[in-house]
Amino acid sequence: MTKHTRRTFLRTTASAGAALFAKALGASAPNHRPSAAPLPAGALPPRQTEDVLFLAASDPGYAAARQPYNAGVLLRPNSIAMCATEAGVQKALQRARAEDWPVAVKSGGHSFEGFSLNDDGLVVNVSPMRDLHLDPHSGLLTAGAGCRLREVNQYLLPQGRFLPSGSCASVGLGGLTLGGGYGMFARKWGLTCDHLRSLRMVDGTGTIQDSADAPDLLWAARGGGNGHFGIVTQLTLQTRPVPKAFSSWKFRAYHLDETRATALLAAWFEATAALPDDAFSAWIMNGSQVTILLTTIGPAEEKAVAAFRRQLAALSSKTSAAPVVPLTKSMPWYYGPPGPEYFKNTSAGYYRGLDDIRAALPGIFFEVLTKPGLVFQINTMGGAMAREKTEGAYPHRAWPYLGEAQAYWDTPFRASNLRAAIGRIRDHIAKAGITRHYANYPDLAFEDWPTAYYGQENYQRLQAIKKRCDPENRIRHPQSVRLPG
């Protein structure tokens, strides 16, 4: 059992009056307490039990429990339910129904558009549910939905196991997995959701569901998005052996204009097309500078990797190589800032290659070159992601590249200008005919977001699950799956 238990959580929130859950905290299998008993019509659950603490806006601890990673999200729920068990989640749903409140779900709080919060409703915060257990024989990891990636890595890596996922340390495992989950190792092993073997969930009616009894829930949880029709409490995922080594290089080019940036991007697309599955690359433009990241868990002198390094080094102003180190030492290099931050990030679509994005590049490059704080990035996908046969709702396996547009600021004036620039980049992307987007990089301005994130057929299937699991549309956000009809 990991040290990241509910007891750890309560120590850190004791100032909020959270000396609750006292009995449950010592349990070794904390999520599987008896189901919450039904309440009489109109009755409210107690404000504090061993399973859940309801925080009002005036309570100490509310601000910390509400805080999203995106500091610009100002939504303020009426109450935040800090849930330590499935029974606590059930009690939270009971209160939401009694108060007729909408429900949002918060784990890591990294939703770009603040979908883990709402105004005047209830937020079910599962961050106390952070127990981790690794079966040493099967390599299966059972994790509470509130676990963060840093905790997962710190738990698994010393045991010689690894879960392919993203790199941001404070991202919640639940949200990452449900939306897909990709990173530097997805080309080798597939998406995080491809490793999902089972889950437990409290649906919108307050009923505990197990994917062993409802296989369509497992299908939906493999890339079908977050906050639609249930609150995941526990995930079981297949881990991998830790790679023996990790190598990385950065190639930097300075003082670029549109012509040189386009030429460098064309060379990058050509070089990445030949990379082995062990390798990952990202092309990142910030102002007039481009940084290209290359990583591999395979041989550093593998033919295609060596060719990539030679080709990109010849076009770059500076090349640097990190020491070859175990993954336990290299992962923290990519953890990113702890947050919160002021930003506006959005999916910039999936591509098959340069031709798909070429028409949008002049407009994108103009914005990035003239607006400090803007970043345009393209990441390699493909590899095992394209070959994976696991049944799931993630629909974009055939596209080997994923773009993202990012803006960061520290003053309101810059926020307005950069948000407008992101909007223009989004328009350039749409006019180029790019319509597929990653659900974990949402944007409220996407017009046909159901098709963009999930595809039409998958979305209709998700709607059928919504109708069964949340017929009152209790769990919702601006881009949650709608009830059919």
PLM features per residue range, with description:
Residues 2-485:
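Soluble FAD-dependent oxygen oxidases
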